[in-house]
Amino acid sequence: MRAYEVVYVLTPDLEEEQVEEKHNEFKSVIERYGGAPGEIDVWGKRRLAYEIDDYQEGIYALRKFQGENQVLTELERSLKMDESILRYLIARDEDA
């Protein structure tokens, strides 16, 4: 399995419990398709470089994980369909 990391930005109007649910939801997608979720680093609410969908702030999080192509495909599909995601980026983790 290859190592990856995903950075995503959630809308700032989510409650703390909702944010935790989102983190767990993406973790379960990784596990469901044979991946191994790693550590998550929640950066919290930060100002965006530019306005996205009328939001000037977002809740940033970085999750490391390992997986094959199907994990990437399904995680990306979940991120695209989730309306509380403003932006995301999945990259291969060269340091792992």
Swiss-Prot record:
Pfam families linked: Ribosomal_S6 (PF01250)
InterPro entries assigned: Ribosomal_bS6, Ribosomal_bS6_sf, Ribosomal_S6_plastid/chlpt, Transl_elong_EF1B/ribsomal_bS6
Keywords assigned by UniProt, alphabetized: Ribonucleoprotein, Ribosomal protein, RNA-binding, rRNA-binding
GO CC field: cytoplasm; ribonucleoprotein complex; ribosome
GO BP annotations listed: translation
CDD domains: bS6
GO MF: small ribosomal subunit rRNA binding; structural constituent of ribosome
Record SUPFAM superfamilies: Ribosomal protein S6
Described purpose of this protein according to its UniProt entry: Binds together with bS18 to 16S ribosomal RNA.
Family membership: Belongs to the bacterial ribosomal protein bS6 family.
HAMAP family reported for this sequence: Ribosomal_bS6 (MF_00360)
Protein name: Small ribosomal subunit protein bS6
The species this protein was found in: Natranaerobius thermophilus (strain ATCC BAA-1301 / DSM 18059 / JW/NM-WN-LF)
Lineage: Bacteria, Bacillati, Bacillota, Clostridia, Natranaerobiales
